[in-house]
Amino acid sequence: MRRLAFILAVLSTAAAISSNAAFSQQPTQTWITDVTIISPENLEHIAAGTMVIEDGHILRIDRSGPPPKPPAGVRVISGKGQYLIPGLIDSHVHLASVPGMNSDQQAGKSQMIEAYRRQLPRSYLYYGYTTVVDLAVFSQKVLQYVRQSPWHPDVYDCGESLPLANGYPMSFWPAEQRFKQFPNFIYDPAQAAKIPAEYKPEEHTPTADVARVKNSGGICVKIFFERGFADNFRLPVITPEMIAETRRAATQSNLVLFMHGNSFESQKFALAGNVDVIAHGMWHWKDRDRGLDRVLDNEPQLPAEIKSTLDQIAAAQIGYQPTIQVLEGERAYFEPEFLSSSDIAKVVPKELLDWFRSPEGRWFGNEINEDHLPAEQFRKIYDEGPIRRVRQATAYLAQKDANFVFGTDTPSGPTYGNLPGLNGYLEMQQLHNAGLSLTQIFKAATINNARKLKLDGQLGTIEPGKTANFLILSKSPLQTLDAYDSISTVFLHGKPIPRESLSATAVQ
């Protein structure tokens, strides 16, 4: 018996030694050689070089002198003729939302939704987004699902958002449900009679709400200034005192303050409140303070008072997310060829795409076109109205070298026009058409985002010590926008992933 035990021990030890030897033979470093390195903090020095990765981080970069010779036992990847850039950051996503569906449409479609959520993180990676930020967490369960997926971008979040009681976006829910859906709301004493008695004012101050975000692990806080939509512009909005308290609490907790605001009035309010990021472009030009109603909306060029506000936003280096695809995401229902794009099949499962094409799947288009206008007329209203205005405001900020931070608001609502990953590529096209240079877009999606999010110690550039999240492309993003669709390999924490393996068509 002792002899048998001894033999088993010897065999076990030998197996362990063999296993350790095999493990030790695995490459501990990856060398990417002869690749053109483009890093946003060093655009004056773009050159071919070698980058060494170890333990998921960039160990060193050699750009000058004779190329170093990789030692034996390391993994070597040739980057000859290709470009290496930081992984992209989308700082405005909503991971729990399913494009094209509200809660009613989701009923009875669990398998379809499960297939979508399996593909969701892969679709962001497919278009190079190695980091995303969820600005308003509706479901920690979905975020955990994404974080536990085999391949997924790094996920940060703002915790639960801070809507004003009964304001946007609480207003979309029935009165008896909205406080359960948005438990981190800001108490409004002026509406005390409309707030259930179980919610105590002292537990829903901006300070208390920000503390809950901090305790949940959030890196940012999201508030809203939205008077409404269409013919209903009577939603309650936060006061200067509320935003001032939120600003103080966010600063004390070292959290980034985002504010939803897509109007002239709201962006003046954001400027006065010293927010860190304005989450949306300016597609409404009304000035409620002066009672101008739709007069400014109809101005063919940027009015002087709007230019003045945009000048101050640019000078203050407030982060700015135009999110033009929010509007294009609605317009997509009136573009007959939109769902025929081969790009869409790469980011959503076939069963969901088939549903988008069904009469039921077009429900949202019918809802936003209440007057049943012809598609051409609907597109014209958008093109000559809010899309024109947001492009003009964005172009002006681009001329002023404003601090653009890239965010897409994916999906902005129950629309199939904002699909994960692809929506980022389409937003880049919108920004370029609006007047941003290729360099401005590149910086917005990398270093500007990293700095504003206080993640620049880890992300945003190609430098030693940074997380090895980066992309290999066949084209330079400083020369052509379609470089962002020329990705060959996505590196996630130092591990290479062939892009095509991330496509929805690759797993069906």
Describe the function of each predicted region:
Residues 37-50, 63-67, 388, 419, ...:
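Acidic, glycine-enriched loop/beta-strand segments at the rims
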